[in-house]
């Protein structure tokens, strides 16, 4: 007997779809759930950017978690600075009121009922030269000009100048009571070229010293309650060694920034770092747009001595955080929903106009209603 065979070739389903290398970097916008392709992409990304080991003594910290920590620390420090400025302003006001004795007399005169008979301004002779001047107790000149702010040498008093609190000193120093200590374990030359804002230069060769291998900041943050130490480099090669050595020496609150500057440059191209990012940390260019980006980053620029993030930097970090956490599919879904809602509104307006026209010509509408709608 002959065996029955199905219709068609059995190898037809195994035939591969030809792929165009020109569009290999284009990804689909449709989320089909977990798949082998996504799993392989995650493994490939972890192999390129991270160096996981089975016997790691240290703990890891994601770049996105560090960005959230930076935003929280900056917001809390700004609130504390505003409170300090308000307290300083209140203290200055109190010192002004205490330095002007004429305000007590003025408050006594204006607190109750108005006194019609005010004494004329008395002239007093304070200077040895015999110049006459008005007394601050009997006139409003001291209140108008502001006692303690204007030069009062004419009345024989010393000038009281209020120096404003300089905000430049606060921006040039690190955050007070910062919960994290960021250490750059690369060489000093690489640190001067590019580093993360608020990071200290702590080369790994410092750990090999026999005398004073730790700085004052490291000793202050070592196993302190509510504080952590974060080490990083470009690609986890040096940072993993430094973190292992420090953990072996008794550092229990030590973390390593996963991915280092390489992942920081990929997820936060702006706002997180200062200076020119090394070429090895830049993402591989894809197409003409990528080539233009690499050409722009070739201009070397030395890193600035920044201890705090500016408002513009924080806005950029927040923007890139939203891009990381909010997938791109939501925007496409939102646009599709908006398009469908607009289509429905247009259909409703067209239906209302048709209803009005049908009311005007009821006889023709009745005759057309029997016909099938196409």
From Swiss-Prot:
Primary location: cytoplasm
Entries under CDD domains matching the protein: RHOD (cd00158)
One family name in Pfam for this protein: Rhodanese
Keyword Nucleotidyltransferase: no
Tissue expression summary: Expressed in various ciliary organs, including Kupffer's vesicle, ear and heart, as well as brain and kidney.
Alphabetical list of PROSITE patterns matching this protein: RHODANESE_3
Domain Rhodanese: start-end pairs: 176-273
Source species, domain of life: Eukaryota
Record-level Gene Ontology MF annotations: tubulin-glutamic acid ligase activity
Renumbered residue ranges of the record's region Disordered: 279-301, 329-374
An annotated GO BP: neural crest cell migration
SMART domains given in the database record: RHOD
Effect of loss of the gene: Embryos display peripheral heart edema and tail defects along with ciliopathy-related phenotypes, including hydrocephalus, abnormal ear otolith formation and smaller eyes.
Ranges of compositional bias, category Low complexity: 329-349
GO terms for cellular component: centriole; centrosome; ciliary basal body; cilium; cytoplasm
Keywords, alphabetical: Cell projection, Ciliopathy, Cilium, Cilium biogenesis/degradation, Cytoplasm, Cytoskeleton, Protein transport, Transport
Biological role: Required during ciliogenesis for tubulin glutamylation in cilium. Probably acts by participating in the transport of tubulin polyglutamylases between the basal body and the cilium.
Family: Belongs to the CEP41 family.
Protein name, as recorded: Centrosomal protein of 41 kDa
Gene that encodes the chain: cep41
């Amino acid at each position: 007997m002959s065996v029955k065979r199905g219709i068609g070739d059995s190898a037809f389903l195994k035939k591969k779809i030809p792929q165009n290398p020109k569009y290999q970097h284009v990804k689909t916008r449709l989320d089909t759930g977990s798949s082998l392709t996504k799993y392989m992409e995650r493994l490939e990304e972890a192999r390129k950017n991270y160096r996981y080991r089975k016997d790691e003594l240290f703990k890891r910290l994601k770049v996105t978690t560090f960005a959230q920590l930076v935003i929280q620390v900056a917001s809390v420090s700004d609130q504390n600075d505003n409170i300090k400025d308000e307290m300083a302003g209140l203290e200055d006001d109190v010192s002004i009121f205490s330095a002007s004795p004429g305000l007590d007399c003025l408050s006594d005169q204006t607190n109750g009922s108005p006194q019609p008979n005010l004494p004329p301004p008395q002239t007093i002779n304070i200077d040895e030269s015999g110049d006459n001047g008005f007394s601050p107790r009997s006139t409003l000149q001291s209140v108008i000009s502001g006692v303690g702010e204007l030069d009062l040498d004419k009345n024989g008093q010393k000038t009281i100048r209020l120096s404003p609190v300089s905000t430049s000193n606060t921006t040039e120093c690190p955050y007070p009571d910062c919960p994290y200590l960021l250490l750059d374990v690369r060489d000093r030359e690489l640190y001067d070229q590019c580093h993360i804002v608020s990071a200290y230069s702590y080369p790994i060769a410092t750990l090999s010293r026999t005398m004073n291998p730790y700085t004052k900041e490291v000793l202050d943050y070592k196993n302190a309650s509510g504080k952590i130490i974060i080490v990083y480099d470009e690609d986890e090669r040096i940072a993993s060694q430094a973190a292992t050595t420090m953990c072996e020496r008794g550092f229990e609150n030590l973390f390593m920034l996963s991915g280092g500057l390489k992942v920081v440059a990929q997820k936060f191209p702006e706002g997180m770092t200062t200076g020119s990012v090394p070429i090895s940390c830049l993402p591989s260019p894809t197409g003409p747009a990528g080539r233009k980006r690499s050409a722009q980053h070739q201009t070397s620029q030395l890193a600035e001595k920044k201890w705090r993030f500016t408002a513009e930097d924080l806005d950029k970090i927040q923007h890139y955080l939203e891009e990381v956490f909010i997938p791109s599919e939501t925007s496409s879904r939102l646009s599709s929903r908006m398009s469908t809602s607009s289509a429905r509104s247009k259909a409703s307006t067209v239906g209302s106009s048709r209803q009005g026209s049908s009311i005007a010509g009821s006889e023709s509408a009745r005759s057309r209603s029997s016909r099938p709608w196409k």
